[in-house]
């Protein structure tokens, strides 16, 4: 069994797919006291290179959601790694990479812990269910309402933020639009809806991810950007409109930014499933961001978001705090 607080630093294998999974693990990792020689396993991207700068990192080939051949390749890569290196424990926040890495670690006698994504409000993901069925790893949820004897509660990465007033408003706010980095999924509906609001202009910045090939957008357009540019564009904007991806939302909250999060839908080919609806619901409950379906996004909602910012309510993350507040934060 994996011990949450060992009382001393230890060499950990820290495993996460890029995007929200990696963002969560970076924020949660200090709870487990990883030593300086701990090793991160993830995919190579501008996000991972920025977040893990100065850390020991082992990159593996990208695994798309529910790519089970990719999971086998991930298992092989981590198995080879464990044949030459030793670790005191392995921790993962998902997604597909966890399915290969944690069983490989357990087969080498390494205690393993899987923490389900904050976006899974109503129960575990496919990855979580498969790992639970394997009986090979310790399990944690960031939502105590569905905790069980096996799925024990762990502190939420979102519960340490609250909304504050900026005392400013704008009828034509400067926008930064960011659509994440998940491969193979476009989000043209959101792009078109933003254009329809009439708020996009020459000062708008777009980070499109894999919604490439658009030639009808005013302002500056990028596919992917490093974390340093993401921070710069976010701070320069009056409002940041994002897909409801956990990684992006966490980054924005850490910057003190109150985001407008728009849900990707599986039925429109925008994601593997509809889990972004759950993270959008949580934003509404905690009142640390506006959230909307694509058709609900309009100029009034965007302009209203310009009135708010976010601040942290504790100085550092602590695994003993409640995973979800008893009532919405204000």
Question: Which residue ranges define each predicted feature?
Answer:
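Nucleotide-activated sugar donor-binding and catalytic core shared by glycosyltransferases
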Residues: 1-330
């Amino acid at each position: 069994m994996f011990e949450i607080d060992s009382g001393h630093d230890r060499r950990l294998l820290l495993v996460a797919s890029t995007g929200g999974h990696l963002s969560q693990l970076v924020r949660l990792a200090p709870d487990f006291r990883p030593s300086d020689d701990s090793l991160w396993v993830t995919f190579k991207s501008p996000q991972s290179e920025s977040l893990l700068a100065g850390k020991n990192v082992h990159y593996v080939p990208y695994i798309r959601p529910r790519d089970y051949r990719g999971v086998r390749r991930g298992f092989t890569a981590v198995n080879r790694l464990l044949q030459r290196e030793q670790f005191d424990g392995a921790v993962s926040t998902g997604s597909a990479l966890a399915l290969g890495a944690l069983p490989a670690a357990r087969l080498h006698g390494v205690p393993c812990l899987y923490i389900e994504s904050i976006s899974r409000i109503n129960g575990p993901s496919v990855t979580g269910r498969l790992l639970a069925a394997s009986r090979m790893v310790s399990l944690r949820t960031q939502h105590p309402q569905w905790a069980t004897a096996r799925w024990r509660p762990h502190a939420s990465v979102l519960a340490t933020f609250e909304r504050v007033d900026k005392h400013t408003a704008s009828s034509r706010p400067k926008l930064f639009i960011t659509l994440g980095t998940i491969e193979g999924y476009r989000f043209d509906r959101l792009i078109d809806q933003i254009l329809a609001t009439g708020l996009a202009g020459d000062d708008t910045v777009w980070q499109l991810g894999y919604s490439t090939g658009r030639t009808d957008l005013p302002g500056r357009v990028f596919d992917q950007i490093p974390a340093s540019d993401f921070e710069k564009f976010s701070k320069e904007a009056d409002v940041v409109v994002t897909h409801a991806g956990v990684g992006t939302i966490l980054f924005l909250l850490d910057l003190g930014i109150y985001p407008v999060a728009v849900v990707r839908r599986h039925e429109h080919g925008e994601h593997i499933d509809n889990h972004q609806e759950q993270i959008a619901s949580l934003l509404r409950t905690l009142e640390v961001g506006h959230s909307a379906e694509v058709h609900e996004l309009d100029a009034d909602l965007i302009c209203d978001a310009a009135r708010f910012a976010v601040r942290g309510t504790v100085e550092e993350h602590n695994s003993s705090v409640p995973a979800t507040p008893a009532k919405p934060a204000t």
